[in-house]
Structures are given as C-alpha cells and as structure tokens.
C-alpha cells in the first residue's frame, strides 16, 4: 500500500442537463479548473452509459464484463479524478436503479444525463497522484509516491 495525505481545496458544484455527457463534462471541468486531484459525488438520473461489472474471472489481465444502461435510471455514486499524462482521467463507480432493479458498476463510456444530474467535486491539495498504464493488468491505474506502509 502507498498513500499520501492532502487537504480539501476548492469545491465545484456542477449541474448536468438532459443529454449531457457526464464523464466528458467531469473531464472538462477538471481541465478548465486545473484540478489535478479530486474526489466527486454524483446524484440524479442517467439515461445512457456503458459500465463494467467486474472481470470475467479473477485473473490478470482482467477481461471486463460490460453492461449497458439503455433507459432512464436513478443514479448515485462516487469517483476520483487524477491525470494521465496531459489529460484528466475519471474513475467512477455508481449504482443505477429503475423500479425494483439496481445495477452497480464502473461507468466507462457513453455516459448521458437524464433530466438533471448534480456533481460536487472536491479538489485534493498537496498530493502528487497520477494515473499510469500498468503493464501487467493493461489498465491505467492510480500511482502514488512515498509513504509505503510497513
């Protein structure tokens, strides 16, 4: 385990309107505001998105199991933003509910708001976290320096 300690910085509140690209919008905010490290919460509704519900098997590199949101769902979740090279990279896990069904996963593509979706983004000041390609997994993962656990 590696870790760093930061402090809360600026807080950004955003509203996504019907049809807005959620992942793209979060990246745009991070780029415009130069948020190099942040955590965010989302609450509202979505009508589209491709998300991953885990690997097919517990092996490395993992083969993702993809699912699709194809209609409106209530949505709530948490995520982080750290940069990969010269661009912000969002990592978001959420729950998506409709009627008596709830789906949970990592939203990765084609994210589309329904009616309204709210975001509260908290900047993390004083950390040097970033995302880098992990050769073994083939995934872009969080990288931290210093403070290894005993």
Range-by-range predicted roles:
Residues 1-90, 95-150:
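N-terminal intrinsically disordered, cationic/polar leader segments
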């Amino acid at each position: 385990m590696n870790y760093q300690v930061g402090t809360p910085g600026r807080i950004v509140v955003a509203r996504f309107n019907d049809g807005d690209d959620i992942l793209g919008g979060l990246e745009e905010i991070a780029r415009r505001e130069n948020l190099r490290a942040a955590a965010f919460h989302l609450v509202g509704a979505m009508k589209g998105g491709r998300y991953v519900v885990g690997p097919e098997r517990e092996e490395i590199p993992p083969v993702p199991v993809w699912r699709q949101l194809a209609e409106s769902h209530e949505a709530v979740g948490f995520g982080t933003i750290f940069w990969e090279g010269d661009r912000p990279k969002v990592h978001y896990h959420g729950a998506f509910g409709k009627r008596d069904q709830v789906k949970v996963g990592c939203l990765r593509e084609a994210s589309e708001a329904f009616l309204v979706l709210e975001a509260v983004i908290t900047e993390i000041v004083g950390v040097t976290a970033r995302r880098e390609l992990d050769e073994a997994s083939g995934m872009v993962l969080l990288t931290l320096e210093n403070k290894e656990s005993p």
